[in-house]
């Protein structure tokens, strides 16, 4: 913040007062409505140039419900905080409903040996790097299908790839950095199949800004005839989310889509991909859970659910979207309230986070806590009243946060420390005067005052499942 020592006190006072005041609710409501209307025009075919009226308000509410349904949000028909949060995420420019600049006929190539041409390049990457990422993006789609892709350096190609900006002649202008990243057209002649990338974005090969491979692979899905998916783990989900390219495999939802259009590959063994966990799966079990500054995080494979206590909403995200340096399949986690840190564990390694930032010197080995080599992984962990409890198989270890060493008498059986908890623990966190233990599809509420289990229920009740 600028220091205004030379300015008159009165001006300084008014400046500080203005910046300290919250945005008036009516201004915020108007801003959110404009954001919503603009978004719905682009992606849900809300007619343009609509003046405010009761009829148009009803149309906007219906379009909002359609958008909320697509993203798995409560269908309020209002531009609430959760809806605006989704709308402000960077994404693909192809609409989520209807067709994108209709091309005649069925959105499917009649031949499977497709050609592509890279018209120009982004200045942030070398030509060789762009070529490599584009090749990888096409390979993602060729492995599970009968499609092949060959680059041509001149002449006509089925799919033309270009980096362009703003209004570039296809009636679908880009909007500058961090909005619409790219778009592509369904199969057909002329512009059909072509993919355009916003040249004002910063394109990379890693987790910084926008990974070209991930965005290109998504857009080429449109070039092949796929529409957007409601599965948040699918490549064809409209919003951008970083995933580690070196270990990336096409999700099952996308495999099913491309094979529906073009059939399976000729390989005797068909590839399978990861599936997105379903919150209300009756067999769902968490890998880890922790609190973080009032929110609750439930980890599963490469995903986590985030529960907002105030909003009463739960959203599913990629771990890599928030913490690109963390591995998938985390096994334990806990929040140290005194140090305002969250610790996450996998195997014998652990990481320390301050909100979304990795602390220096991590990952470290769990031997720092005093674990012997015989302990190869931690099942769950929770910190309370200066002690951290670690759960390994049927044993409980207790660590003193001040002395930074294990307490005498530990490890001991979990049931001897927490009567009624007679099972292996998958995840645990503390809320009020309770430890919430998760084991398989159930959770146990253990009262820390009465020292007994007071409730046993389904784990996914925490994900708002009926």
From Swiss-Prot:
The active site is at 219. Residues 1-20 form the signal peptide. Belongs to the peptidase M10A family. The keyword Zinc applies. PANTHER family: MATRIX METALLOPROTEINASE (PTHR10201), NEUTROPHIL COLLAGENASE (PTHR10201:SF137). Its EC number is 3.4.24.34. Glycans are attached at residues 56, 113. Hemopexin repeats lie at residues 277-326, 327-373, 375-421, 422-465. Zn(2+) 2 binds at residues 92, 218, 222, 228. It comes from Rattus norvegicus. Keywords: Calcium, Collagen degradation, Disulfide bond, Extracellular matrix, Glycoprotein, Hydrolase, Metal-binding, Metalloprotease, Protease, Repeat, Secreted, Signal, Zinc, Zymogen. This is Neutrophil collagenase. Zn(2+) 1 binds at residues 168, 170, 183, 196. Its cofactor is Ca(2+); Zn(2+). GO terms for molecular function: calcium ion binding; endopeptidase activity; metalloendopeptidase activity; metallopeptidase activity; peptidase activity; serine-type endopeptidase activity; tumor necrosis factor binding; zinc ion binding. Can degrade fibrillar type I, II, and III collagens. It is found in: Cytoplasmic granule; Secreted, Extracellular space, Extracellular matrix. Ca(2+) 1 binds at residues 158, 190, 192, 194. One of its GO terms (biological process) is endodermal cell differentiation.
